[in-house]
């Protein structure tokens, strides 16, 4: 008697009723091309608003408390241009990280027709998520906030109200880098401004009253120090994750490595684009994946 080749399914909840592909409905209509990705999560939206508010607060203090009242016009112009450029790039990176599809797996694609179209060999394993009824590529994980399986998911970040995954990791790294830079720049300017005010008359070093000036500068100093530490750690963690080609979830779960090992430089190019260029530092340049290997549906 001839045996019919079968394929093995694995799901994250071990529920037998989910193992039948017929249980899944056809995937919904994906919508028009270019539809904006946005997660409707109250906590994430609030965190994103707070992020913008803190950056704009820093802009206000830097411009109206320190730079505009300064008599050194060259100092004010140079630092104003640098700080505003970094702040603009930080907010642009935040928008791209928040509004870019991080790599969502098509929802409801675990249908009999789709599974047959994969042309799987006998004995091959496919991963199926019962929560969104999707066939998951290798290294994809389900996000309970986004309610989707995300390819190469690192973590869900409420500050960008999105998952950090295959398609938006570059923008998240740039966001942490530029926030760290403007925090460091703001702290340096606060230090110089305090020295200037101690040497001169406090009533002449700011257009605000001395008590108001001190309060605004102390708040900015606290904000800058907090964000400098936080984003520097996140930036270093992300760069290390990229170089080792191991996401935060994979490190946490200590998952077995089933993908080909590549050099650190190739891993960097896979995230930031091929080849190396100034576009790596631009949130407006979409990474060109070049010859980067796609993450397959089977292992």
From Swiss-Prot:
Transmembrane annotation, as ranges: 48-68, 73-93, 172-192, 215-235
Keyword Glycosyltransferase tagged: no
Principal EC category: transferase
Main location group: Golgi
Single Gene Ontology BP annotation: protein palmitoylation
EC number, UniProt record: 2.3.1.225, 2.3.1.-
Cytoplasmic topological intervals: 1-47, 94-171, 236-299
Covalently lipidated residues, kind S-palmitoyl cysteine: 146
Subcellular location: Golgi apparatus membrane
Keywords, ordered alphabetically: Acyltransferase, Golgi apparatus, Lipoprotein, Membrane, Palmitate, Phosphoprotein, Transferase, Transmembrane, Transmembrane helix
Topology versus the membrane: Multi-pass membrane protein
Highest taxon above the source species: Eukaryota
Tissue specificity field: Widely expressed with significant expression in heart, lung, liver, skeletal muscle, kidney, testis, thymus, small intestine and leukocyte.
InterPro entries: Palmitoyltrfase_DHHC, PFA4/ZDH16/20/ERF2-like
Spans within the Extracellular topological domain: 69-72, 193-214
Pfam families, A to Z: DHHC (PF01529)
GO molecular function, one term: protein-cysteine S-myristoyltransferase activity
Keyword field contains Heme: no
Modified how: Autopalmitoylated. Phosphorylation by FGFR1 and SRC probably regulates the palmitoyltransferase activity.
UniProt similarity note: Belongs to the DHHC palmitoyltransferase family.
Protein's recorded name: Palmitoyltransferase ZDHHC3
Species, as recorded: Homo sapiens
């Amino acid at each position: 008697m001839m045996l019919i080749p079968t394929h093995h399914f694995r799901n994250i909840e071990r529920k037998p009723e989910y193992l039948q592909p017929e249980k899944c409905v056809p995937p919904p209509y994906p919508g028009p091309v270019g539809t904006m990705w946005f997660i409707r999560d109250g906590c994430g939206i609030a965190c994103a608003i707070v992020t913008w508010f803190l950056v704009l607060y820093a802009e206000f203090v830097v411009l109206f408390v320190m730079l505009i009242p300064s008599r050194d016009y060259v100092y004010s112009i140079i630092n104003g241009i640098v700080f505003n450029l970094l702040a603009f790039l930080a907010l642009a990176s935040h928008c791209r990280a928040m509004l870019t599809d991080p790599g969502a797996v098509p929802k409801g694609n675990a249908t009999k027709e789709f599974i047959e179209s994969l042309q799987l060999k006998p004995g091959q394993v496919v991963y199926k998520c019962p929560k969104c009824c999707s066939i998951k590529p290798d290294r994809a994980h389900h996000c309970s906030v986004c309610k989707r399986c995300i390819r190469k998911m690192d973590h869900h970040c409420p500050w960008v109200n999105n998952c950090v995954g295959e398609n938006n990791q570059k923008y998240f790294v740039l966001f942490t880098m530029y926030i760290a830079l403007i925090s460091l720049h703001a702290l340096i300017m606060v230090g110089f401004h305090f020295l200037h005010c101690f040497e001169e008359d406090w009533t002449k070093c700011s257009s605000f009253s001395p008590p108001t000036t001190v309060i605004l500068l102390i708040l900015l100093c606290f904000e800058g120090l907090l964000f400098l530490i936080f984003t520097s750690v996140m930036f270093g963690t992300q760069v290390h994750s990229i170089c080792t080609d191991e996401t935060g979830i994979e490190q946490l779960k200590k998952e077995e490595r089933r993908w080909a090992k590549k050099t650190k430089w190739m891993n960097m190019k896979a995230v930031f684009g091929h080849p190396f260029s100034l576009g790596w530092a631009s949130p407006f340049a979409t990474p060109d994946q070049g010859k980067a290997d796609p993450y397959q549906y089977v292992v």
